[in-house]
Every structure is written in structure tokens, then in C-alpha cells.
Design a protein with these regions (language model features):
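Membrane-anchoring hydrophobic helices of lipid-metabolizing enzymes
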Residues: 1-58, 63-96, 237-258
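Non-catalytic C-terminal accessory region of glycerolipid acyltransferases
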Residues: 1-9, 100-258
Length: 258
């Protein structure tokens, strides 16, 4: 991670994208822990890492903390993305990386749906996929770290996936499950200027209710995971119900916006 690099882009490219291109409105940033470890569990759409980058920008600019996001190894196979993501603090998504970050008292960003969420077809973009092995819950229990779920409405529209092309060669090289077909990708990989709304939900302090040993209890881990997913889905549904346009308007009350 290079804080100077992040701060430089935070005043230029990231600020432009956040404030003018996607016009991001954020709510609940006060829920980010001011110190110590914590897990930011998000919903990733659009297959490119822009929603993670914008979440990083929001947290850094509003709280001064620098979360490290777990990054799919496929993104790091592209040289121009590998350097970019590494300087932003991205680390290869694996348990060892997560353990190291949490043990250092840092924030970690995780997308529990995994790569399936990133490649969700647009017609199902705002229905959360399954959370896989629930490793993020086990990490929260073992490291006594609060879980802060967060969701974004609007990021699915930057590269809305209408079709997928299966290609073994493409998958072998990129580790992507398919070639996504959107209005602009792959012919012109420019994201669309949709309006974004990001909400950070109240932290779930699992350490208050469970001991670290609970990480070995499959039933407890699954129950916590389902609770996280349910809260995220409820937040998404509420935001969608308030959204009147993909490109304009707000889903938050004025006092909710950071």
C-alpha cells in the first residue's frame, strides 16, 4: 500500500469519479471503526474493481483510515491493474492475507459473494448471491473484529452484463469465468456515468456474543453469514424502492448523507 499514491489520486481522479462522474452519495460512514481491526463486507458489481476503489476513497477521505481490499488474482494478471491495485493496498484474496491484515489491527475489505457477484447478469444484479465458505465470518470471530456490511446501488449500471461468452482460453489466462458483454465492454471499456448510492450499515460486533472458538461451529458461522446477507439485501431493496432514476436523484434523506 502507498498512502501517498492514494492521497494523490484522492485529490484528482478518484475525486472526479466520485464527485462528478458517478456523483456518489454515501451514508453511514460513521459506522466505520475509528481504530482497530474491522471487516468491511461489501457487494461487488460491474466486474471491474471500481466499486472497491470508490469504497476505499470514501473511507480514506471521510475517516482517514486505509482499508486493504482482498483482490481476485485474475485482476493482478493485467500489468496495468496489478501495479494500480497493489499501490491501493489490494492483496491477493486468501486467508493468509486476511489473517495478516487483521492481526495488524487494520481494516480489510471483503466481497463475500466472490467472483460470482462481480459477473452477475444485470437482470439479477441487485439480488445477492450466496456467500460461499463464509471465511469472513470465521475471521471476524477469530480476530474479534466487527463486521460492517456495505452496499452500493448504481455500480451495477457502469458495466451492465447482458450476456456472457464462455471461453476456456480466456478463463485460463484471466481466471474470469466468462467474457462479459455489456453496452461498452469489451469493444470500448468505458464505464457508464450512473448515479451511485453507497450505504455502510451499523457494525455487527460478533465478539460480544461469541467466543473465538465459535469460528469452528458451522451452524453459528452460517447463521451470522445469513444475518449479514439479509441485512445487505434489505438495504439494497430499500434503496432500490427509493430510486427514481439510474442517472439522477438520491435515495437518502439529506441528514443521512456524509
Amino acid at each position: 500500500m502507498d498512502p501517498g499514491y492514494i492521497n494523490s489520486y484522492g485529490k484528482t481522479l478518484f475525486k472526479y469519479l466520485s464527485d462528478y462522474y458517478w456523483r456518489i452519495e454515501a451514508s453511514g460512514l460513521e459506522n466505520i471503526p475509528g481504530h482497530g481491526s474491522g471487516i468491511l463486507a461489501g457487494m461487488h458489481r460491474g466486474f471491474m474493481p471500481w466499486d472497491g476503489v470508490m469504497a476505499l476513497h470514501l473511507v480514506v477521505s471521510k475517516t482517514g483510515r486505509y482499508p486493504r481490499f482482498l483482490t481476485h488474482s485474475g485482476l493482478l494478471k493485467f500489468p496495468f491493474l496489478a501495479n494500480f491495485m497493489t499501490k491501493l493496498g489490494g492483496v491477493v484474496a486468501c486467508q493468509q492475507s486476511a489473517e495478516r491484515i487483521l492481526s495488524s489491527g487494520e481494516l480489510i475489505g471483503i466481497f463475500p459473494e466472490g467472483i460470482r457477484g462481480a459477473f452477475t447478469r444485470y437482470r439479477e444484479a441487485y439480488k445477492l448471491q450466496g456467500f460461499g465458505r463464509d471465511t469472513f465470518v470465521k475471521l471476524a470471530l477469530q480476530h474479534r473484529a466487527p463486521i460492517v456490511p456495505f452496499v452500493t446501488v448504481g455500480s451495477a449500471e457502469i458495466f451492465p452484463i447482458f450476456a456472457k461468452i464462455e471461453s476456456k482460453c480466456w478463463t485460463r489466462y484471466t481466471e474470469w469465468p466468462c467474457i462479459p458483454i455489456t453496452p461498452t465492454f469489451p469493444l470500448l471499456p468505458i464505464p457508464l456515468p450512473s448515479k451511485w448510492h453507497t450505504r455502510f450499515l451499523p457494525p455487527m460486533d460478533v465478539a460480544r456474543e461469541y467466543s473465538p472458538e465459535a469460528a469452528q461451529d458451522r451452524a453459528i458461522v452460517r447463521a451470522i453469514s445469513r444475518e449479514v446477507r439479509a441485512k445487505m439485501q434489505q438495504a439494497v431493496d430499500e434503496m432500490l424502492a427509493r430510486r427514481r432514476s439510474i442517472y439522477h436523484g438520491s435515495v437518502f434523506k439529506s441528514e443521512e448523507v456524509a
